[in-house]
From Swiss-Prot:
Hydrolyzes both purine and pyrimidine ribonucleosides with a broad-substrate specificity. NCBIfam families: PRK10768.1. This is Non-specific ribonucleoside hydrolase RihC. CDD domains: nuc_hydro_IU_UC_XIUA. It is an enzyme of class 3 (hydrolase). Its EC number is 3.2.-.-. InterPro entries: I/U_nuclsd_hydro_CS (IPR015910), Inosine/uridine_hydrolase_dom (IPR001910), IUNH (IPR023186), Nucleosid_hydro_RihC_nonspecif (IPR022976), Ribo_hydro-like (IPR036452). GO terms for biological process: purine nucleobase metabolic process; purine nucleoside catabolic process; pyrimidine nucleobase metabolic process. The lineage of its organism: Bacteria, Pseudomonadati, Pseudomonadota, Gammaproteobacteria, Enterobacterales. It comes from Escherichia coli (strain SE11). The gene is rihC. It comes from the Bacteria.
Length: 304
């Protein structure tokens, strides 16, 4: 039986790969997509998500979400993904539009209609998820678990300690981590290992139309290089759903720093139990890199 999922995203070049896997992995049933401001503005992430759905002729409803963090001024990652968020490929024109309700209500309504609890996957800042949990607490029993790409047990990628998706809205992440729902965190500890090699990248133009499109996007992606390999951060959240055997997880207490002058956005991961607090997150700490690369090749071959 396919696993029903809702995907909250901020495309973003590596988001595009994760969306492809969510659509084409035969084990998954992608039922709803929502967008959030993150890599670029929410208007751009929504446009990019609609372009991808049209490219794959995927009839999946999409709702636009939060334009700004809960408290802070927005920050973006245009230096990594380009000003549009998906520079490098000319998508054809289309007339698709997002749903007429915001992401918060789209997720709430879809959860309440679902015949069984649904897995939420968040690969951008956690603003939409925090709004859902705080404004619609009646939805909690309908959430099977939340799988996120975000955080780190060690160093960061936008500050010395903080990973971008958490740092973009620390207050939202803190709300989510305190919520009591089951959380799997695929952070930089594994995503920095999730590298597509130059040899594989060079085969993409011959793979299929998705390979050609991704190869064009990758030429503008700044999380690594085509010569040294590219890190597929967001794809790890989808990979865990399909191949959890590739990941080493440890239950840990995780808190989000929201006050520190130099540490705001840091996920404080208590690996050794020093704080004596109960674990609230399953933290991915290691990855079978070869197995991950093989799985990526298999799923992208299906993305025609």
């Amino acid at each position: 039986m396919r696993l029903p999922i809702f995907l909250d995203t901020d495309p973003g070049i590596d988001d595009a790969v994760a969306i492809a896997a969510a659509i084409f992995a035969p084990e998954l049933d992608l039922q709803l997509m929502t967008t959030v401001a993150g890599n670029v503005s929410v208007e751009k992430t929504t446009r990019n998500a609609l372009q991808l759905l049209h490219f794959w002729n995927a009839e999946i409803p999409l709702a636009q979400g939060a334009a700004v963090p809960l408290v802070r001024a927005p920050r973006d990652a245009a230096s990594v993904h380009g000003e549009s968020g998906m520079a490098g490929y000319d998508f054809v024109e289309h007339n698709r539009k997002p749903l007429g309700i915001p992401a918060l209500l789209a997720i709430r309504d879809a959860l309440m209609r679902a015949p069984e609890p649904v897995t939420l996957v968040a690969i951008g800042p956690l603003t939409n998820i925090a709004l859902l949990l705080s404004q619609c607490p009646e939805c909690k029993p309908y959430i099977r678990r939340l799988v996120i790409m975000g955080g780190s047990a060690g160093r960061g990628n936008c500050t010395p300690n903080a990973e971008f998706n958490i740092a973009a809205d620390p207050e939202a992440a803190a709300c989510v981590f305190r919520s009591g729902i089951e959380i799997v965190m695929c952070g930089l500890d594994v995503t920095n290992q999730a590298i597509l090699t130059p040899d594989y990248l060079s085969t993409l133009p011959q793979l299929n139309r998705t390979g050609k499109m991704l190869h064009a996007l990758f030429s503008h992606y700044r999380s690594g290089s085509m010569q040294s390999g590219l890190r597929m951060h967001d794809l790890c959240a989808i990979a865990w759903l399909v191949r959890p055997d590739l990941f080493t997880l440890k239950p840990c207490f995780v808190a989000v720093e929201t006050q520190g002058e130099f540490t705001s956005g840091t996920t404080v991961v208590d690996i050794d139990g020093c704080l004596g607090k109960p674990a609230n997150v399953q933290v991915a700490l290691d990855l079978d890199v070869k197995g991950f690369q093989q799985w990526v090749a298999e799923v992208l071959a299906l993305a025609s």
